[in-house]
Amino acid sequence: MNGHHQQNGVENMMLFEVVKMGKSAMQSVVDDWIEAYKHSKDVALLDLINFFIQCSGCKGVVSGEMFRHMQNSEIIRRMTEEFDEDSGDYPLTMAGPQWKKFKFSFCEFIGVLVRQCQYSIIYDEYMMDTVISLLTGLSDSQVRAFRHTSTLAAMKLMTALVNVALNLSINMDNTQRQYEAERNKMIGKRANDRLELLLQKRKELQENQDEIENMMNAIFKGVFVHRYRDAIAEIRAICIEEIGVWMKMYSDAFLNDSYLKYVGWTMHDKQGEVRLKCLTALQGLYYNRELNTKLELFTSRFKDRIVSMTLDKEYDVAVQAIKLLTLVLQSSDEVLTAEDCENVYHLVYSAHRPVAVAAGEFLYKKLFSCRDPEEDGIMKRRGRLSPNANLVKTLVFFFLESELHEHAAYLVDSMWDCATELLKDWDCMNSLLLDDPLNGEEALTDRQESALIEILLCTVRQAAECHPPVGRGTGKRVLTAKEKKSQMDDKTHLTELFAVSLPQLLAKYSVDAEKVTNLLQLPQYFDLEIYTTGRLEKHLEALLRQIRNIVEKHTDTDVLEACSKTYHALCNEEFTIYNRVDIAKSQLIDELADKFNRLLEDFLQEEEELDEDDAYQVLSTLKRITAFHNAHDLSRWDLFSGNYKLLKTGIENGDMPEQIVVHALQCTHYVILWQLAKFSETGSSKEELITLKRQMRVFCQICQHYLTNVNTAVKEQAFTILCDVLMIFSHQIVVGGREALEPLVYSPDSSLQSELLSFILDHVFIDQDDDNSSSDGQQDDEASKIEALHKRRNLLAAFCKLIVYNVVEMNTAADIFKQYMRYYNDYGDIIKETMSKTRQIDKIQCAKTLILSLQQLFNEMIQEHSYNFDRSSPTFSAIKELARRFALTFGLDQLKTREAIAMLHKDGIEFAFKEPSPQGEAHPPLNMAFLDILSEFSSKLLRQDKKTVYAYLERFMTFQMSLRREDVWLPLMSYRNSLLAGGDDDTMSVMSGMSGRGSSTRSKKIKPPTGKRKLPEAEESSSSDSMWLNREQTMNTPVMLQTPQLTSTIMREPKRLRPEESYMPVYPMQPEHHQPSLDYNTQVTWMLAQRQQEEAARQQQERAAMNYVKLRSNLQHAIRRNTGLMEDDEEPIVEDVMMSSEGRIEDLNEGMDFDTMDIDLPPSKNRRERTELKPDFFDPASIMDESVLGVSMF
């Protein structure tokens, strides 16, 4: 028996190793097994059974004795016991190159086995029955490895059988035709023997087909019906993938509603990979137009689901859903309604490029691929007469209808792969813009011409840069040789075309700012060498003349900056046209500078009210100079002095037009930045550095003056520039080997920091209704609100950058942090990122800033409600909630934030006991309620740190305080409670139950610390702050240093203390133990000595006090917070969320024949009853039912 067992092991190992290594001799191995089967069925089948067991990762071996005398269920139970419970890996899930090929080889083995057996032993009613019975039993196992491997084997076995059934069907049809042909012959020519042979062959084929159908029914009913809704997504995906193959391979038998319903139901699966398999399976069906008639009912029932899947949370699923709809569209134009198509159209503007590209292909198939046969004769025509002319117009109409006029680049990129020829037909677009319309042709409207120019610019950019627009894609990639050649050809073609036509286009649309702005960007993508090689210098001269005319005509900032960038693109020293362009640019700036100085001199000499015409002339000239200074170094024109005079006069007189001040500030900013850039690149003399330093500081003073201007635009411009200048000239300026610029380092004084912070508080943290920039129309009003919010976010980000880079004091961030909850929707991401960055710089200082922000809010509440506020009030609850959110930002690693959390508690305790009650010691300190807020951070303390903080808290408490049980002392009791809880206990404060967020009873017991503090004599007189630490702890709590109270520009004290009270950092001691004010370390030593003397009495009294606290706390409900909208401060928890809501698949059977075909063969007697494992709820909703899917591994 042992020898036989060993022989089986060797044979089995050979099969498994062949499959694992993926050898090409798979057919010969199968043939050898077939020969072994013909010689000894049981031995060969035992080898095959052990092969499946080993492929499942099981170390057990089925012996001959087990095979002969045990039922399948008993064998599987025995094999389950042989599993290695310490590892959940098995061949189908193992990592490594050899296992990646295993699945393919495993599936190939099963397919080859059936193919080689299809004319012989497959019909012996033993081999296939045994294999199917085994796989059915294994697929019903609670062991995932058995279930996964056997389901894959069964599904591949079914696929192979479907192929056999298809061949049998074809042979039957051929035999039937031969029989009919022979029978229809004349009696004299008819061969009766042949008729008998054909009848016998048809009968054999029919019997074989019946046998194969029985096998398929057994697999389908025994495996598929139960496993397509398995708890494991991979198993469900296998089932759906294979049923798609069956329907495509043998559509006559499987492509009907009885099988399609499983795919339709599973499109609601909660896992994206399963939904993806549904879509790919359907794509294979819809691709074959001959099958469309069989899909009509399915399409009508599940079309809405497919359309909704274009918005799937998994982008891969959304892409395949769009591709499937494209195939549906090609099969029939009438299936998809206009609303269905519109749901796909808008996805061309998606930021996810694969989704957008798929939507672009759908759009192209729907709107652009239908060509009139009459156009075949004009295919070679170009320009306005080309067949693309109407398609270009259609594209323009679609772009305008979508009402997303700022996203033409996204539209072009979406269609770039499928409509390249159309989008690169620049001759057609150029002709539509320049040429007159033909007879009977309707001319483009002004709005359509603007859209066409914008699309034209985007196509030129896409062809020249060869990468998606900003916000779509991962960035630039290395181009292939073919792509580089295409890029060069495109740049050559567009340069040859637009170098000639661009001056004409600019002349035609010179008065239209929007059109001109887009057209002026075209030269940025030119191959400038063609101006010389193509002898196009005269067209360059025409272009420069048009640009000069546009500069003289327009004062719009966008137009002027486009002109400036065009000069910058053309002024490339690598090309021979540089001198010509540079001369034209210099002449233009000379005229502008002279005109500005002349106008400025006259303008500043006007003593009476400023003349509007003169002001307009000054403003228009200043706007032109500022636009050019943005892209060009105009230092040699000495623009600083003129702008300085203008700004200084505006400060002195106070009546300077706002736009003049705004552009003068911007122009002066450019002057300073260009000077700094030149010094950084080429170096500078000491005198030049001194001059720049003086100019920079004078300019900062001017900006600081304008922060208090009455005009909002001026204040915002001054603030933005100030933040930029302070950032640029901070200590960072010397980084990277620029030590020579150290004299330029400028740090803002406290007054400037206060003004910057005040600006943020007054202009950023405001309600939308307070912003006076809204318009009259509802749509314009909404757009203006969004624009105003975007502007305020930029202002806040500029100031937060100063905090992050330590340009301003970190404690100024307290006024920002305290707005976190109130303005979470508008600025939550900015404030949270600022917290994160400041914590990286200095954890302790960041923690002190957070507690300072809570103290400020607490003081503001006291000012508004006095000290008799209700701790269940919304204001106090909001502060507690903010504290909880702050605590969440510290993360889960308590060791990293240990020192910061300890310092936070120290500052909080000092603040709570800072103000003694004027009614005497029988009443709590005025800020005692702050301990309720501080308790939100207790869960972030380590166990030993809780004991240390508790000891520090006791220093501020009198003996009578520990005995107080009135409600006004609840914050102290709650805070002590949180410190005495276990190290891992996330105990919340007692009063949290009044905050309205729901409550739950905690069962954790509160234990007082049992360790006694004992200090060596040598340390009793030490001045180290660590004397207050518990020496029995294995880890030392961070030192709590005495620090001054942080203040801020708007922090208001509710009450001014007497000098002697404000000096004392702790609550007054008992009268009999009263001591003069001591330093921090002396107090620690004194307190420890007093505790050693009174230890016995205090322990007894504290036991009584703690027993009361425990009793009271057990009667209170600790809050278990409900997860809210903004719980993302914690580590994200990834969940599998069902795409469709429950009940969406109701009445799916209505109108469809969903009766599964009957099984002719009875279930195998070796198969375990399924009711023992789980109920057989054959309902589409059972896919979403966790009770049905809840199959554990063991």
Swiss-Prot record:
- The answer on whether this UniProt entry bears the keyword Protein transport reads no
Q: Where is the composition biased (Low complexity)?
A: 988-1001
* Keyword Membrane part of the UniProt annotation: no
Any one Pfam family match given in the protein's UniProt record, by short name: STAG
| Superkingdom | Eukaryota
The region called Disordered is annotated at: 986-1027
Annotated Basic residues bias = 1002-1013
Q: What keywords does the record list, in alphabetical order? A: Cell cycle, Cell division, Centromere, Chromosome, Chromosome partition, Mitosis, Nucleus, Phosphoprotein
Sorted alphabetically, the Gene Ontology BP terms of this entry are: cell division; chromosome segregation; sister chromatid cohesion
* Domain SCD per the UniProt entry, residue ranges: 224-309
Family stated for the protein in its record: Belongs to the SCC3 family.
Tell me the function of this protein: Component of cohesin complex, a complex required for the cohesion of sister chromatids after DNA replication. The cohesin complex apparently forms a large proteinaceous ring within which sister chromatids can be trapped. At anaphase, the complex is cleaved and dissociates from chromatin, allowing sister chromatids to segregate. The cohesin complex may also play a role in spindle pole assembly during mitosis.
Quaternary structure note: Part of the cohesin complex which is composed of a heterodimer between a SMC1 protein (SMC1A or SMC1B) and SMC3, which are attached via their hinge domain, and RAD21 which link them at their heads, and one STAG protein (STAG1, STAG2 or STAG3). In cohesin complexes, STAG2 is mutually exclusive with STAG1 and STAG3. Interacts directly with RAD21 in cohesin complex.
Q: State what protein this is by name.
A: Cohesin subunit SA-2
